[in-house]
Amino acid sequence: MNTSTAISFVAALVLCCLALSANALQIEPRSSWGAVSARSPSRISGAVDYVIIHHSDNPNGCSTSEQCKRMIKNIQSDHKGRRNFSDIGYNFIVAGDGKVYEGRGFGLQGSHSPNYNRKSIGIVFIGNFERSAPSAQMLQNAKDLIELAKQRGYLKDNYTLFGHRQTKATSCPGDALYNEIKTWPHWRQN
């Protein structure tokens, strides 16, 4: 086997593994955490340009499905009540129980980053990530979710990744998580 063929083979193998990884991602539906129906969901047509990463700023995060579902339900209650959003603000929630939960989901406008809501997918990590980064599993789940969004046509191949602090004056998604996402291939300085 010549060098060119070997490189092509390795590249194909890597792409195959990435595709399998994203296809293996299980997204827990809204019904799994007892979501209340959205008041007036707004559809987004076509692929969006941005992924915005957040943290929920819960000091202890969650590690069991019961804890995570309760926290997600509380976030939705806060967003619909105190903040008067039509639904939970995020499109997806990455939780410490090793799962990804559907917030608003794909193809719906979030309420997580003013000026970017109509052109982004908002992903929140449950926990406070000022001093320590999320687990390797949480980080991989977010990467797999982003890959899945691209594969399904909800996210452009040349998307830009931002931390919430790049779209609004806030410390979100925490220094440790922000420093982590700055190493991801689509992160850009704005």
From Swiss-Prot:
<keyword id="KW-1015">Disulfide bond</keyword>
<dbReference type="GO" id="GO:0005576">
    <property type="term" value="C:extracellular region"/>
</dbReference>
<feature type="glycosylation site" description="N-linked (GlcNAc...) asparagine">
    <location>
        <position position="158"/>
    </location>
</feature>
<dbReference type="GO" id="GO:0008270">
    <property type="term" value="F:zinc ion binding"/>
</dbReference>
<feature type="binding site">
    <location>
        <position position="172"/>
    </location>
    <ligand>
        <name>Zn(2+)</name>
    </ligand>
</feature>
<feature type="binding site">
    <location>
        <position position="54"/>
    </location>
    <ligand>
        <name>Zn(2+)</name>
    </ligand>
</feature>
<keyword id="KW-0479">Metal-binding</keyword>
<keyword id="KW-0399">Innate immunity</keyword>
<dbReference type="GO" id="GO:0045087">
    <property type="term" value="P:innate immune response"/>
</dbReference>
<dbReference type="InterPro" id="IPR017331">
    <property type="entry name" value="Peptidoglycan_recognition"/>
</dbReference>
<dbReference type="InterPro" id="IPR002502">
    <property type="entry name" value="Amidase_domain"/>
</dbReference>
<dbReference type="Pfam" id="PF01510">
    <property type="entry name" value="Amidase_2"/>
</dbReference>
<comment type="similarity">
    <text>Belongs to the N-acetylmuramoyl-L-alanine amidase 2 family.</text>
</comment>
<keyword id="KW-0391">Immunity</keyword>
<feature type="domain" description="N-acetylmuramoyl-L-alanine amidase">
    <location>
        <begin position="47"/>
        <end position="174"/>
    </location>
</feature>
<keyword id="KW-0325">Glycoprotein</keyword>
<dbReference type="GO" id="GO:0009253">
    <property type="term" value="P:peptidoglycan catabolic process"/>
</dbReference>
<keyword id="KW-0732">Signal</keyword>
<dbReference type="InterPro" id="IPR015510">
    <property type="entry name" value="PGRP"/>
</dbReference>
<keyword id="KW-0862">Zinc</keyword>
<feature type="binding site">
    <location>
        <position position="164"/>
    </location>
    <ligand>
        <name>Zn(2+)</name>
    </ligand>
</feature>
<dbReference type="InterPro" id="IPR006619">
    <property type="entry name" value="PGRP_domain_met/bac"/>
</dbReference>
<feature type="disulfide bond">
    <location>
        <begin position="62"/>
        <end position="68"/>
    </location>
</feature>
<keyword id="KW-0378">Hydrolase</keyword>
<keyword id="KW-0964">Secreted</keyword>
<dbReference type="GO" id="GO:0008745">
    <property type="term" value="F:N-acetylmuramoyl-L-alanine amidase activity"/>
</dbReference>
<comment type="function">
    <text>N-acetylmuramyl-L-alanine amidase involved in innate immunity by degrading bacterial peptidoglycans (PGN), preferentially DAP-type PGNs. Probably plays a scavenger role by digesting biologically active PGN into biologically inactive fragments.</text>
</comment>
<dbReference type="GO" id="GO:0042834">
    <property type="term" value="F:peptidoglycan binding"/>
</dbReference>
<feature type="signal peptide">
    <location>
        <begin position="1"/>
        <end position="24"/>
    </location>
</feature>
<feature type="glycosylation site" description="N-linked (GlcNAc...) asparagine">
    <location>
        <position position="84"/>
    </location>
</feature>
<feature type="glycosylation site" description="N-linked (GlcNAc...) asparagine">
    <location>
        <position position="2"/>
    </location>
</feature>
<feature type="site" description="Important for catalytic activity; essential for amidase activity and zinc hydrate coordination">
    <location>
        <position position="90"/>
    </location>
</feature>
<dbReference type="InterPro" id="IPR036505">
    <property type="entry name" value="Amidase/PGRP_sf"/>
</dbReference>
<protein>
    <recommendedName>
        <fullName>Peptidoglycan-recognition protein SB1</fullName>
        <ecNumber>3.5.1.28</ecNumber>
    </recommendedName>
</protein>
